[in-house]
Structure formats: C-alpha cells, structure tokens
C-alpha cells in the first residue's frame, strides 16, 4: 500500500482533519460499526483521496467537496475475501469485480491456480494485468501446486521452488497460494519444502490446505511454515485448528458445515482474532444472486452468528490475515474502503466506497469495469481430432 505513504497526501489529510481545508468526500449521518470495540456509534467520516482523514462526531463538519448523506445507515469497512478463485466462477476478473464490488466486497485474495496449471507464468501474468486497474482490490498469490498432482497429469507448466521464488520477488504477488500437497510437506519432500521455504524467505504468507490433518500431522504441517486453512470438515476440526494456532478462513462453499461452525464459535463466547471469511469457489449463478463474500456474511448471521462478529471476521480479521494494516478498520489514517448498509441481517449495500471513491449504489456499480483481452488464451484446449470411432459404442446384451 505504498500510495498511502505519499507525504503530500498525508499533509492534505492532516490539514483536513484539523479543519484547515475541506474533505474530498464527507459521509454523514451514519452509524459506525466499531470493529475493535463492537460498539455501534453515530459518526461522520471525512475522506481525502484514498485516505480516511477523520472519524468525528456527527454534524461537527459540513465542509466536503462531495457530501454523501447516509442518515440511519450502518458504516462498515469494505469486506475482504481472503481466499478465492476467479476461475471457479467462470467469468473474467472484470465481471467478477462488478458482481461483488456492488455488494460491499472491496478486496479479494486470488489464487490463480487453474490459470497457472494451464498456461504457466503467462497465466499468472494475466491475473496481474487483468486486475491491476480494477476498483476491486485483487491480491494475487503464487500458485504452489502446478501441477496439482505431479506425475499423475499433463499440466501446462511445472512450478518448482525457483519458479515460485521468482514470482514472490514481484511486488504484485502477495504470498504463496494454498499448499495442497500436504503429505509431501509433512514428509519433508524437497520440492514442496522448497516451495514453502520460498514463501518464508520472501517474508510473505504461506497459505494452507489442511483438510483432514490432525494431531502430529497437523503440527508438522504448521512447523514447516504453513499458516492458514480453509478446508474444515467439522466443528471439532475448527476448534483443534484454532487451538493449534492456524489462521482459519471460514468458507461459504460448504454451507452445510456453517451451522456447526457458528455453534462452536457461539459456545466459545467470542470471535477469535484468527478467523476470517472466504468464498473459495462460487458458481456463476450464486455469484450473480449472492454477491460473493457478502452472501457468506449473510448466511453466517442467519445461522446465529452475531452480525458484529461476522463483519469483524470479514474486515479487521481479514486484513490481519493478509498483512494489510491499511484495511479492515474505519479510522483516521486507514484506507477509505467503506460499505454503507441499511441493516445487519440482509446486508444490502446502499453505497460502496472503494479507495475513497463512491463506486456502487443500490447493488449496481456506477461504471462497468474495462475488460483486459484474453486472446492469447484462446484455443488452449488441445484434443485429438474427433472421429466416428471416438463416439461409437458397442451394445451389450
């Protein structure tokens, strides 16, 4: 987030907070959901460029070049989806952006695993190029399992530790994507150990996939350097991994497990700081009607999780998970990603502010995102010529 280190921006924001110059955008009349204390309190928000300059008592300032009156609505930080695959939704990044941004999701962490398994480094390059100018913030990760099953398939590339290390050296890459080859990591196999070590050496997160791991195997996976998991199988699995110290990403794609997770968290009596939310895989129709991570928040609350906890998991905890101190909190000095909600059950976004700009209203983006051409990836499915023998069958009697 180096743009927020701009000295002139900070001076302008400081002057606006003092009252010596107007805000670029003033949001007034809202009720702030405080992700630190859990309180609901009336507050106005002054924004300069992409930065929150002031969170102050309602009605104490009226000087904004643009004023957004949200009287009675709730103010939440923008939602952060800490693990997802655009490919699973079978849409382009620009289409995905417009589908979720309109509902309050302002940051997603993309593992372009399928792109890389077909197209290799050019697939990862496309993920970066196709997202860099979108109003939805994409944190692109370096796929760790290309191919996903070494020796068992014909992938379009082979990412060893050196390849992953090269990707991690790029500032656009936010970490190592989910490490699915758990057994080789636990066994200390050189290839996977080297990939995990590349993430540690780069000082970037190493994301996990710890489905079914328990006891010594789980401890070994974590000791290798993997820090998170989204592949929970039960409430007891959730609690073991929380107690072990993994950062848990509750995912919405296994809806049947969410009530069990909610029951365990409610029994615990508080939301751990190491619980964030993710979608992982969302089918196109669910994306269209649910809005991505917003729908996960909505369902968790419907199953009985306090709305403040669900939002904290989707904002402040998510920011902590991805190491972004500029996100996840409505406070002076933080990035101005804000969603304005009419209530805390339906979670319908009245307005969405991303990077200091109003980008959506009543579930629709104000400007459609621009597509980046994908021509190099056309005709990439290579099959033998279709013959009559290929579709013939023998009738069995």
Please give the residue ranges for each predicted region.
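Hydrophobic faces of well-ordered beta-strands that scaffold small-molecule active sites
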Residues: 80-82, 108-110, 138-140, 177, ...
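Conserved small/polar residues in nucleotide/adenosyl-binding loops
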Residues: 394-397
């Amino acid at each position: 987030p180096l743009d927020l280190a701009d000295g002139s921006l900070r001076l302008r924001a400081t002057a606006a907070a003092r009252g010596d110059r107007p805000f670029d955008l003033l949001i007034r009349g809202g009720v702030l959901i405080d992700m630190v204390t859990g309180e609901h309190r009336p507050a106005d928000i002054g924004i300069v460029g992409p930065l929150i300059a002031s969170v102050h008592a309602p009605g104490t300032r009226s000087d904004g070049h643009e004023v957004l009156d949200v009287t009675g609505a709730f103010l939440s930080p923008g939602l952060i989806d800490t693990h997802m695959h655009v490919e699973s939704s079978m849409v382009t990044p620009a289409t995905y952006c417009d589908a979720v941004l309109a509902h309050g999701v302002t940051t997603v962490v993309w593992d372009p695993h399928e792109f890389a398994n077909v197209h290799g480094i050019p697939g990862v390059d496309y993920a970066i190029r196709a997202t860099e100018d979108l109003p939805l913030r994409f944190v692109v990760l370096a796929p760790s399992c290309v191919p996903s099953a070494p020796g068992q398939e014909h992938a379009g590339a082979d990412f060893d530790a050196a390849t992953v290390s090269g990707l991690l050296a790029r500032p656009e890459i936010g970490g190592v994507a989910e490490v699915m080859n758990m057994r080789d990591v636990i066994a200390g196999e050189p290839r996977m150990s080297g990939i995990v070590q590349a993430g540690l050496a780069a000082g970037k997160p190493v994301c996990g996939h710890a489905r079914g791991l328990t006891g010594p195997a789980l401890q070994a996976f974590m000791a290798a350097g993997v820090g998170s998991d989204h592949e929970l199988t039960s409430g007891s699995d959730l609690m073991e991994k929380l107690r072990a110290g993994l950062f848990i990403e509750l995912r919405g794609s296994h809806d049947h497990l969410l009530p069990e997770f909610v029951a365990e968290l409610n029994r615990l009596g508080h939301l751990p700081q190491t619980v964030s939310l993710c979608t992982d895989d969302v089918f196109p129709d669910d994306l269209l009607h649910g809005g991505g991570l917003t729908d996960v928040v909505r369902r968790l609350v419907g199953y009985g999780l306090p709305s403040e906890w669900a939002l904290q998991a989707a904002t402040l905890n998510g920011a902590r998970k991805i190491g972004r101190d500029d996100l996840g909190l409505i406070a002076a000095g933080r990035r101005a990603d804000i969603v304005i909600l009419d209530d805390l059950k339906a979670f319908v976004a009245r307005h969405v502010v991303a990077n200091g700009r109003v980008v959506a209203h009543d579930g629709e983006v104000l400007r459609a995102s621009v597509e980046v051409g994908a021509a190099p990836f056309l005709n990439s499915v290579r099959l033998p010529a279709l013959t009559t023998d290929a579709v013939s069958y023998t009738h069995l009697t």
